[in-house]
């Protein structure tokens, strides 16, 4: 114990004392020790020769992936765990931060605990043979999450999956949406964290012996035992790279490396849809500042270490199927890093390291990963606002989320974004990811008595279809409300099953080891097709919509007479309908019982599944044709927001965060000239636009999320025809960024047909 205390004292030398020394409390450490920065980017250094050499090597593999739409390589015989692979390098002599998921760059691992079927599907898609022993083990001896879920699913849920009224459920792959507090590895070292977990384990003994909440207590004891074991395995993994992480980091290089080792353990053992990195830049700046002041490193060396960390995050890959890629296209893993924001005490959390992270988009060029997310506040330093705006204009690689909305909601300044738009407090909260429900199809079920318009089979509860020649708004709304009740029940039932089985068969021990003992859980539901449903209701209410029926009386098309207000133009007649749908569905979800008493939340988010949803949904009363993509996330339907940027932003900002606390995704594309004639004016105008969209006060809620693309449609058309000219072209789509060349032609076309705002 004295040896551990000596390690702690040495590592913490020069830091301001606080509660963080007596308990696991990273926020307190940051608040006591960080240096806010309000200056500009002039201090930044460029790429070193080592960085350029390493990144050129990585880009060879990335270009191959772009060209083939297939993995560079993947395992077929080794089930991945924290310790399953030997050390891997790009070029060991040049790397300042080390660690790969497997023994080779961009080689993907087998992670079978979520489900063997996805692995079999991937092997088949890419003409590789899965080792028969892997299949035998995970079919006959070791049950998977996927098998557990399908053992318990109801016939109703299976029909909902087949029809696409529920899509993307994490029932065949890792759920993700959990952020380990990877900073804890650097600040405390593994031995301290293992000691803390042992104390947590012991704290449950009295409840266990007295039969208090017996099942929950036994489960938590087992989970903590697994967490403790995972921490030990992290030490073993790091030792393969020549590092002893039993004690805390003693300098900036170790702080970055230790933090990354915590994350590497997560992505070696889990293939979650979103494996977010957290909120590390300000934490790491404390170590960098200490070393800079002591003359131990230069600014060039600081940037190089950040570059090599970010390079590793860019290289994380999971083995997926083409069907998965349709929903989440372009290999996203959502290594989301939340940057900036303001502290509860009024100081900015922007540091020089916030700039260094953004600078990687210049030292190594644009990239979709890590999913860099600016926590925007009107009170952010002006220099940082303008630099972030410049980075968006130059790279289209950033997303923005409203710190002035979320910080007071949590009463906490140490939250981060999981996945795309979903906030949670780091190390204290986790999400049960729930994909999304299709509101546009739900409306068609209301009109057709629960019969699916594409499959021509009964999916929803059997009821009389609407019979009249003209759709009546009140009748449609009454029936839709009934079908939303049904859908909410199917949805929550499915998610309860999924997350019970994931905890049982694919528990995220390494991630949860970097959480407190008792965490807050949210049941993160979602809706898709919001603008389609709102516009359809608007058409029914304000125009005349006549259903066209087939020989079986099924409404398969709609004829619209007259004009109707469309979402995205700051028209309260339709905007209020969208607001009502969000609030209405959330209230229905909130009435239902959730697994582990998770707090129900909801997102308005689609990822790239707006294309898949469109394929699965027939003609809708707004005039959208069968198969046409939905507007992504909370976006208006393509081309319908005709009154400029401010009107479109205003419509989306009306959607209530109080009923969508899992996030509201809005993707905004604007041509450069619409922002101004020169770079300085464009930076100022883009920053001003975000100040306006995110402006938040008690009486007027600000928008929650904004993807920003600044580019011309002509460039995207050229990139479709000449992909080799644009190997790193990055664009923002619903909730994340993606290399344009990694999208399918269909998805590229969808992006190109979206609204490119020509005026403010």
Swiss-Prot record:
GO cellular component: a single term: cytosol
UniProt-listed CDD domains: PFL1
Induction: By pfl-activating enzyme under anaerobic conditions by generation of an organic free radical. Exposure of activated pfl to oxygen resulted in cleavage at the glycine residue harboring its organic radical with loss of the 25 C-terminal AA.
Location(s), subcellular: Cytoplasm
Recorded superkingdom: Bacteria
Transmembrane segments: none
Name recorded for this polypeptide: Formate acetyltransferase 1
UniProt enzyme class: transferase
Purpose: Catalyzes the conversion of pyruvate to formate and acetyl-CoA. In addition, may be involved in the control of the activity of the formate channel FocA, via direct interaction with FocA.
Modified residues (Glycine radical): 735
EC number: 2.3.1.54
Extra remark: Several mechanisms have been proposed based on complexes formed with substrate analogs. After activation by the glycine radical, the cysteine radical, Cys-420, can abstract hydrogen atoms from the other active site cysteine, Cys-419, and from coenzyme A, and it can also transfer hydrogen atoms to product radicals. The other active site cysteine can attack the central carbonyl of pyruvate and covalently bind the product acetyl group.
Modified residues (N6-succinyllysine): 63, 107, 117, 124, 195, 454, 467, 654
GO BP annotations listed: glucose metabolic process; glycolytic fermentation via PFL pathway
Occurrences of domain PFL (ranges): 3-625
Entry similarity comment: Belongs to the glycyl radical enzyme (GRE) family. PFL subfamily.
Organism from which the protein derives: Escherichia coli (strain K12)
Reactions catalysed, as given in the entry: formate + acetyl-CoA = pyruvate + CoA
PROSITE patterns: GLY_RADICAL_1 (PS00850), GLY_RADICAL_2 (PS51149), PFL (PS51554)
Record InterPro entries: Auton_GlycylRad_Cofactor, Form_AcTrfase, Form_AcTrfase_GR_CS, Gly_radical, PFL_dom
Pathway: Fermentation; pyruvate fermentation; formate from pyruvate: step 1/1
Modified-residue entries (N6-acetyllysine), positions: 63, 117, 195, 454, 541, 591
Ranges of residues in domain Glycine radical: 632-760
One Pfam family cited in the UniProt record for this chain: PFL-like
